[in-house]
């Protein structure tokens, strides 16, 4: 693990509303940071991106409601930041074959997925929607002086029952396409994250801890960004929409 622009095995420091189920409401708001963005903010920079392409994926967790309540999660939204100084995709499908959402308690299972096509932001699953957050007003992500677009992924129609007040894990990632002229290497998926106190926006449930999973979704412990390539803790940005049931 480390902060290395060229390592294949590294953790990289790395809005529009879709249609939701009737009665669905925002219950977790840990959205994109609104303050202290990019290198212009110096040591107070809040935004970062992370990936873990050693042999699995990076995730995080959240809780919905209060203990004793029952909820059904309708939709989960996250963001990704692909590209670097050498290659910047026009579409998310240029870099990735698919996108997947894993969800669960200790270990995670896939609950939604969609195929992607080069030259397009359309997906093979109407319940998975991709949009460019930077077109909707999000600030471009500064990666070592290269400005990168931020892509929003909405997984809808999930129908996931959860217990109120209990933390559940999630992970979003995509299978990378082969990198031209880089034999055996594929594009790594980068999750948008931020430091909660510096974000200037609601960061529900942020605890400065992310989660590691192998490719099958089995838990491999926790990850703290501080001291592992960054100078402060971070959480993956996520928004959750759900409805309460009796």
Describe each model-derived feature in a short phrase:
Residues 90-203:
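Aromatic- and Gly/Pro-enriched, solvent-exposed loop/edge beta-strand patches characteristic
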Residues 21-51, 245-246:
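Boundary/junction segments of secreted and surface-exposed precursor proteins
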Residues 1-10:
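Bacterial N-terminal signal peptides that target proteins for export
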